[in-house]
Structures are given as C-alpha cells and as structure tokens.
C-alpha cells in the first residue's frame, strides 16, 4: 500500500496575486471511497479497512488500558483511530509519524528499552513516546498498529506488556480478515 504525501503548489501570475494550493497526493493503488455532498461536490477519502473496526478497536483499547494500566493507542496506516487512558481529543485523528510508518513496514514489534535515547514518537505533533508497539497485519497486508504509550515515571515494560500488545495486534488483524 502507498502513502499520502502533502504538497504545496504555487501558481504565479504577473498581474495577479500568487495562488497557493495545498493538496494531498495518494499513491497509486490505494483504495478510495467516493462521496458526494448535498451541493454535488465530490469527496475522495482514502479507504481504511481498520476504520471499520473503530468502535471495536476503541472497546478493545479500553479493556487493554484497564488491564495493563497504560495508555493505549490504535492507528490505521495514516491516523489514530482509537485512544484509551488519555484525552481522546489530544490524539484522535492525528497523523502517524514517519517513524511509526517505518516500524509498521518492518512488521516487527517494538519495545522501548531502559536508557534508550532514540525513542519512537508514534504520532505527529504529540510529545509522547511508545513503550511497546506492534503492527496489525491482516491477510498479509499491514493495516495499522497498536501500542502502549510511555508515561512519566512508569516502570519499563516487561514481557507481559509486550505479549499483550502482540496478541492485541494479532487479534485485531484476524478481526479484519473476517
């Protein structure tokens, strides 16, 4: 699957002010949903299969947060779709970071180690770091990720937290396949 690139286009004219257009470029092969509004305007939206699990992912995140006592974030390939243990408006619908995109592409879980200096910041514009993260894979395709966020003064993650996130990613992936 491709990615969405953000571009700025400037149209210059000698006798008129410059026009600046901001556009999102969707990669070739990405599925789109096409809508029309009441005025007949056409709206293109990148299809997110994990978005269909939004309510389910939100419930799963809440149970996981209560069980582990750590903040949980679920993302599709582009945005945060579910949050538990933190204010939702702080993270919901925010764009995932390039470093999280890279992690998803590796298809391997991540666990922050004690004293680690290069921490994984999973969400753009939010100064929080992942303690454990795992990609969600369905039918051989990466469709998102789930993670515990590190909190101030929390103990380092152990095998139990790593296994919880890995199982959660596997379970959400299986739900996507059905």
What are these regions (language model features)?
Residues 1-14:
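Short Lys/Arg-rich basic patches
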Residues 13-25:
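Short beta-strand-centered segments at strand-helix junctions
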Residues 35-47:
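Short, basic amphipathic alpha-helical segments that act as recognition/interaction helices
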Residues 40, 136-146:
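Short hydrophobic/glycine-rich mini-motifs in sensory/regulatory modules
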Residues 50-52, 58-125:
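Structured interaction and signal-relay segments at domain junctions
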Residues 51-63, 93-102, 110, 147-178:
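Juxtadomain coupling helices with adjacent low-complexity linkers
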Residues 125-137:
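A short beta-strand signature within small-molecule sensing/ligand-binding domains used
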